[in-house]
């Protein structure tokens, strides 16, 4: 699959989707994207910058949602113009898809909306690649139905069916907790879509702080290593220059100052894993 100008797959180096949870300001967005570009260029990691113009599913109605679609998209367009990097953002409403697709290179669907057929179809018919997040409530084998909906919609519109990714971001484990079952990555590979592992939302503690979600960022390296050892096409990680001051999802964000060291470790692991065959199918 060609994604934003580079090939992705289990026979290719992992690509990285990374950035701040939400667009907080133009300068911070440009600075963060610029630093991530430098790190990824040094390590040879294909990179897509990610940030949200609107966090439509915050725990509290009083929480910061973003700068609004117009301003958020303007800033993301500046990232593309100034830094020449592809950008990704998530959409929450069907009527937002067209204006967002006019700016970004990749769309993302929120995990909560993975079962909304009309929404998935509309995203699939945008003409853009789509990173489809698996719901925290969904079994991994049920992602085949979601990917099939997207492919059917693309085919109906005369578009390529080879533009969808399946993204794992943890599964609900009781209240205010998520766990990651690495078997799900192998199961989701059976869809034929490139699999992405979201290493930061997987350590989120949803609603764990009452009016906001908590998180355990110390486990991001653990789960990222496990995902690469299992075999994935890409990683998703949110980061922030100062997570303690982040306006959304700070507790599970990787400090920007630690991204280089983390990615260096992950690149070494990914190269080692992809030099040897995956034997899962030989055990059936």
Swiss-Prot record:
Catalytic activity as recorded in UniProt: D-arabinose 5-phosphate + phosphoenolpyruvate + H2O = 3-deoxy-alpha-D-manno-2-octulosonate-8-phosphate + phosphate
Disulfide bonds: none
Gene Ontology BP annotations: keto-3-deoxy-D-manno-octulosonic acid biosynthetic process
Recorded GO MF terms: 3-deoxy-8-phosphooctulonate synthase activity
Compartments, record wording: Cytoplasm
HAMAP family per the UniProt record, alphabetical: KDO8P_synth (MF_00056)
Name of the protein this chain belongs to: 2-dehydro-3-deoxyphosphooctonate aldolase
Organism listed in the record: Burkholderia mallei (strain ATCC 23344)
Gene this chain is encoded by: kdsA
């Amino acid at each position: 699959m060609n994604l934003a100008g580079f090939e992705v797959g289990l026979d290719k180096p992992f690509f990285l989707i990374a950035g701040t949870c939400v667009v907080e300001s133009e300068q911070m967005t440009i600075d963060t994207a610029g630093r991530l570009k430098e790190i990824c260029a040094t390590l040879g990691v294909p990179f897509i910058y990610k940030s949200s113009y609107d966090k439509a599913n915050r725990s509290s109605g009083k929480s910061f949602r973003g700068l609004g679609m117009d301003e958020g998209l303007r800033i993301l367009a500046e990232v593309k113009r100034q830094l020449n990097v592809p950008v990704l953002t998530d959409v929450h409403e069907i009527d937002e898809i067209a204006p967002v697709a006019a700016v970004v290179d990749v769309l993302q669907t929120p995990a909560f909306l993975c079962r909304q057929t009309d929404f998935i179809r509309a995203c699939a018919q945008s003409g853009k690649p789509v990173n489809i997040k698996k719901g925290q409530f969904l079994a991994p084998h049920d992602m085949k139905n979601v990917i099939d909906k997207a492919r059917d919609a693309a085919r109906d519109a005369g578009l390529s069916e080879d533009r969808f990714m399946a993204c794992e971001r943890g599964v609900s484990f009781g209240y205010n907790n998520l766990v990651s079952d690495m078997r799900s990555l192998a199961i989701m590979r059976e869809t034929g879509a490139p699999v992405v592992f979201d290493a930061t939302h997987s350590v989120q503690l949803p609603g764990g702080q009452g009016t906001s979600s908590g998180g355990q960022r110390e486990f991001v390296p653990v789960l990222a290593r496990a995902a690469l050892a299992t075999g994935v096409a890409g990683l998703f990680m949110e980061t922030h220059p100062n997570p303690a001051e982040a306006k959304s999802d700070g507790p599970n964000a990787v400090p920007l100052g630690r991204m280089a060291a983390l990615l260096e470790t992950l690149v070494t692991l990914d190269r080692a894993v992809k030099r040897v065959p995956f034997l899962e199918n030989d055990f059936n």
